[in-house]
Amino acid sequence: FFADLIDELKKAERYIFIEFFIVEPCQILDKLLQILSKKAKEGVDVRILFDSIGSVALSSAMESDYFKSFGIQSKIWLKFIPVFNTGLNNRDHRKIISIDGKVSYTGGVNITDEYANIYSKRFAYWKDAGIKITGPASRTFTLMFLEMWNVQNKKDVPCENFENFIPKEAQLCLENHTGKGKAGLVIPYGDDAYNGADIGENVYRYILQNATKNVSIMTPYVIIDGSMMDTLIFAASRGVNVELIVPQYYDHFISFCVGRTYIKNLIENGVKVYAYQSGFIHSKVFIADNKMGTVGSINLDYRSFYHHFECGTFLYRTKSIKEAQKDFDKTKLECKEITVENYKKIPWYVRTTGWIFRIFGPLM
C-alpha cells in the first residue's frame, strides 16, 4: 500500500489531499513528508486533515507549526475540548488520499509505523486492506475531502469552488457517459455522522441481502444492533455461506470482549466465524458471490454505522473483487474457526466482561 502510494505521490502535479483518523510521528510519516515537502516546493497544493482524538499524538502546536514548516496546509477535525459536548463522538474516521483527482486511496490503513508493519509493540503482523482507485471515480474522494476541509473554515472564510479541483477529462467523461458497455462499477461513497442516512451500514446490508451463494467479511470489531444481526443470520438461513474473519488478539480489551458476545449469537445461527492467528486483522472488507463488495474504513460496529464520518468504495464486477476474495481465502488459512464448542473455552473473564459491558455497545 505505502510503496504504491509513494510512487503516485511523486507524480502529483496539482494537489495532494490527505485525510486520516490517525496520524502520528513515525518513520512512515517522515518518508511521506519528504515527498510532500518537495511537491509543495514545486507548487503542488498539499493539505492534511486529521482527527484530534485519533491523532492525539500530534499536538495543536504541531498542527500549526510542524506541517507548515514543510509547506503543507493542515487542519484538525473537531479539536478536542475536555468538556462534555454532543459532537465528541462524531470523529473523522475516514482514510482518504486524493492525487490530482485522478488517483485515490482508501481502506483501513492509518499513518503509523504499526499499520505499515515497520514496528509494533503489540502484534507480530498488522493485517489491513486498502484499495487504489484511478480514473473519474477518484473525483468523489476529492469532493469528500473538500467538504470536510471547508466545514473547518472560519465563518468569514468562503467555501471553495469544488469544480476547480475536478480534472477536465473527468468532467468530459461525465458529460459523454452513455451507461453502455461491459465495464464494472466503482462507486466511492461517504457516510455523514449528522444526516442519519447510515450509508455505510446500508451498503453492508445491501450486499448481504443480495448475496445468493457466499459472503466473505473481514472486520476487527463485531458490535452490532439487532437489525444487522438479523440480516447476517437471515442470509445464512437462506443458504448463503456467510463467513467472518475477526481478530484472535485484541487492541481494545472491552470492545474485544463485547464483540465475542455478538459472535456467540452468530455462530449459534449458522454464520461461520474465524479468528485470525498471525497478528491483528484491521481490514474492513465485504465480498459477495465473487461479483460485488466494498472496501473502506467502516467497521462492523455502532461507532462506524452511526457516530463516525466514514468512507468506502462499492465494487461490482471488477477485477479487484476477485483479488479481495483471494486475499480472504488466503487469510482464512491463518485462522481457527470459532465453533459453539470452542466458544465455551474462551476464558470466563472475557465472556463475563463482554456481557457486563454489552449494555454500552451502542457507544462502541
Describe each PLM feature range.
Residues 1-364:
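Charged, low-complexity intrinsically disordered terminal segments
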